[in-house]
């Protein structure tokens, strides 16, 4: 019987919290705590439905600095950046200096055909009868 009363009381407390949550506005009251927030920290710790506050946990640093996010030197070491840079420079130089192959000739032919289909210069404005195929 006692467990039934406890479960009913817990359900009533949850319902009251839900009503408080639904009725509160988006802006907190000007002073003090919100009426929807429990005043007792022990009650807040016991409720498993409430989210864990990061700012109040032991995981939060006392004072945040850039070093927490980017690391102490705030730059990548040269021995990590240099190989990637040299590889990209070598690729660009190779693409520029290599001899043309059959694939390059085919690609140039395909691209030039597309250029020939598009007229150069501004498109001519068509009059309304010519636009619809009427003879003038």
Swiss-Prot record:
- Region annotation Disordered: where it falls in the sequence: 26-58, 112-136
Query: Has keyword Chloroplast?
Result: no
One Gene Ontology cellular component annotation held by this UniProt entry: mitochondrial inner membrane
Q: How is this protein positioned relative to the membrane?
A: Single-pass membrane protein
Q: Which Pfam families did the record assign?
A: CCSMST1
Q: Which InterPro entries match?
A: UQCC4, UQCC4_vert
Give start-end of the signal peptide: 1-15
Subunit-structure text: Forms a complex, named COMB/coordinator of mitochondrial CYTB biogenesis, composed of UQCC1, UQCC2, UQCC4, UQCC5 and UQCC6; stabilizes nascent cytochrome b/MT-CYB and promotes its membrane insertion. Forms a complex, named COMA, composed of UQCC1, UQCC2 and UQCC4; activates MT-CYB translation. Forms a complex, named COMC, composed of UQCC1, UQCC2; UQCC3 and UQCC4; mediates MT-CYB hemylation and association with the first nuclear-encoded complex III subunit UQCRQ. Complexes COMA and COMB are bound to the mitochondrion inner membrane by UQCC4.
Q: What does this protein do?
A: Required for the assembly and stability of the mitochondrial ubiquinol-cytochrome c reductase complex (complex III (CIII) or cytochrome b-c1 complex), a multisubunit transmembrane complex that is part of the mitochondrial electron transport chain (ETC) which drives oxidative phosphorylation.
Q: What is this protein called?
A: Ubiquinol-cytochrome c reductase complex assembly factor 4
Q: Which organism is it from?
A: Mus musculus
């Amino acid at each position: 019987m006692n467990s039934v009363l406890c479960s009913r009381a817990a359900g009533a407390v949850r319902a009251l919290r839900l009503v408080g949550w639904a009725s509160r506005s988006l802006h907190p009251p000007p002073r003090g705590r919100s009426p929807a927030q429990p005043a007792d920290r022990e009650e807040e710790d016991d409720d498993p439905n409430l989210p864990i506050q990061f700012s109040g946990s032991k995981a939060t640093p006392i004072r945040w600095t850039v070093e927490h996010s980017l690391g102490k030197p705030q730059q990548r070491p040269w021995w990590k950046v240099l190989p990637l840079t040299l590889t990209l420079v070598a690729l660009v130089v190779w693409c520029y200096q290599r001899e043309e192959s059959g694939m390059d000739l085919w690609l140039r032919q395909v691209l030039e055909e597309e250029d020939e289909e598009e007229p150069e210069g501004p498109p001519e404005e068509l009059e309304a009868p010519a636009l619809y195929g009427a003879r003038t």
